[in-house]
């Protein structure tokens, strides 16, 4: 559970702003905003989603900074509540909607701060997923970097040895690698994984639309990745019940339960949310399915006024230029309030926004 995950991290006082009040858009306003989101998704050529702990609360895994989040309750001297374990948690409607959006080619890449493993267990392809803070079900060989996805949590945290050895042989007839396997869960001071960070950074830079779901965007560098889309002329949509660090940069802000927002979005796009039939690990994306017919999106309102601070969508953005291919140095989890350093940031305690 996220409770055990949080307890396993090193002590750290600055965990960001916790327990901020939740905001709910009125039903009519929520509907207008989701229609606008559907237009943006349909008209964009490279859509990247960024997910945080808020997308897993419906599965029984508590978040961290919400009204009843792990760190919010900790600040109040109360014990957090939990309803499930990582092994028994089921992917939510949001998890499965993201699977389908990728299948039909409407989702280019997925960046997650969550460690609960629900994206992988939902069947989302791992080659289109960056898990910046690790995965409770994954261990990696310290020697050859082969990763193993397990059926149960690996049992350690902080990139520690799990007690198992790598069984991969480089060629037929050769002896197994036998490198030491380590968990992939970061502690506050650990550097983000190079591969995942490089992929997330490149995808965010090349996106013409970034959508954040269930994250307060307080942890750097993960929380700043959506801004790379804005800097390259793309659009940013934030879906969260609480205020986020980057609200002022958003073209559209939606305050509603993420499952409700994603369910409405899929309906407007003419897509079904697939049922989950058990854990399924997909290493590489399958050939995309045909896109559904062009949805009959509601016409925009004539008024150019902002919707609760959001900017109405303009003409379709041209795809951003390709990233030059340089890989950023592995930053570390830093405090959410500290200014962005010029050197690779550290994953400081306020950063772990696990699921």
UniProtKB/Swiss-Prot annotation:
Acetylated at Lys-33. Deacetylation at Lys-33 by SIRT1 promotes homomultimerization and binding to double-strand breaks (DSBs) sites. Phosphorylation at Ser-10 by MAPK8/JNK1 in response to oxidative stress stimulates the mono-ADP-ribosyltransferase activity on PARP1, leading to PARP1 recruitment to double-strand breaks (DSBs). Changing residue 33 to Q: Mimics acetylation, leading to impaired ability to recognize and bind double-strand breaks (DSBs) sites. Residues 287-296 have a biased composition (Pro residues). The modification N6-acetyllysine is found at residue 33. Its cofactor is Zn(2+). One of its GO terms (biological process) is ketone biosynthetic process. Compared to the defatty-acylase activity, the protein deacetylase activity is weak in vitro, and requires activation. The histone deacetylase activity is strongly activated upon binding to nucleosomes and chromatin in vivo. Two molecules of SIRT6 associate with the acidic patch of one nucleosome, while the C-terminal disordered region of SIRT6 associates with nucleosomal DNA, leading to efficient histone deacetylation. The protein-lysine deacetylase activity is also activated by long-chain free fatty-acids. There is a cross-link at residue 170 (Glycyl lysine isopeptide (Lys-Gly) (interchain with G-Cter in ubiquitin)). This is NAD-dependent protein deacylase sirtuin-6. It catalyses: N(6)-acetyl-L-lysyl-[protein] + NAD(+) + H2O = 2''-O-acetyl-ADP-D-ribose + nicotinamide + L-lysyl-[protein]; N(6)-tetradecanoyl-L-lysyl-[protein] + NAD(+) + H2O = 2''-O-tetradecanoyl-ADP-D-ribose + nicotinamide + L-lysyl-[protein]; N(6)-hexadecanoyl-L-lysyl-[protein] + NAD(+) + H2O = 2''-O-hexadecanoyl-ADP-D-ribose + nicotinamide + L-lysyl-[protein]; L-lysyl-[protein] + NAD(+) = N(6)-(ADP-D-ribosyl)-L-lysyl-[protein] + nicotinamide + H(+).
């Amino acid at each position: 559970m996220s409770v055990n995950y949080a307890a396993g991290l090193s002590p750290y006082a600055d965990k960001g702003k916790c327990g901020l009040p939740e905001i709910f858009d009125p039903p009519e306003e929520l509907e207008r905003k989701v229609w606008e989101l559907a237009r943006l998704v349909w008209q964009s050529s490279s859509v990247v989603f960024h997910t945080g702990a808020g997308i897993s609360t419906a599965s029984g895994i508590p978040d961290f900074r919400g009204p009843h989040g792990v760190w919010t309750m900790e600040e109040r001297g109360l014990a957090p509540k939990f309803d499930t374990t990582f092994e028994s948690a089921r992917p939510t409607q949001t998890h499965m909607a993201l699977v389908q959006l990728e299948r039909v080619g409407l989702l280019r890449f997925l960046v997650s701060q969550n460690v609960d493993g629900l994206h992988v267990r939902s069947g989302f392809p791992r080659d289109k997923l960056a898990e910046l803070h690790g995965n409770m079900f994954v261990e990696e060989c310290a020697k050859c970097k082969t990763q193993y996805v397990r059926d149960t949590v690996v049992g350690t945290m902080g990139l520690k040895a799990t007690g198992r050895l790598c069984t991969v042989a480089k060629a037929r007839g050769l002896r197994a690698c036998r490198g030491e396997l380590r968990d992939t869960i970061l502690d506050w001071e650990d550097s983000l994984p190079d591969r995942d960070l490089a992929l997330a950074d490149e995808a965010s830079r090349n996106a013409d639309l970034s959508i954040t779901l269930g994250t307060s965007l307080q942890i750097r560098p993960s929380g700043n990745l959506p801004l790379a889309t804005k800097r390259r002329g793309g659009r940013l949509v934030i879906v969260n019940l609480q205020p986020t660090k980057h609200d002022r940069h958003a073209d559209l802000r939606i305050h509603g339960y993420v499952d409700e927002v994603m369910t409405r979005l899929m309906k407007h796009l003419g897509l079904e949310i697939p049922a989950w039939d058990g854990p399924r690990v997909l290493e590489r994306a399958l050939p995309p399915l045909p896109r559904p017919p062009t949805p009959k999106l509601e016409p925009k309102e004539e008024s150019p006024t902002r919707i609760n601070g959001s900017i109405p969508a303009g003409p379709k953005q041209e795809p951003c230029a390709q990233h030059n291919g340089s890989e950023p140095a592995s930053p570390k989890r830093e405090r959410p309030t500290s200014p962005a350093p010029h050197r690779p940031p550290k994953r400081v305690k306020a950063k772990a926004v696990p699921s």
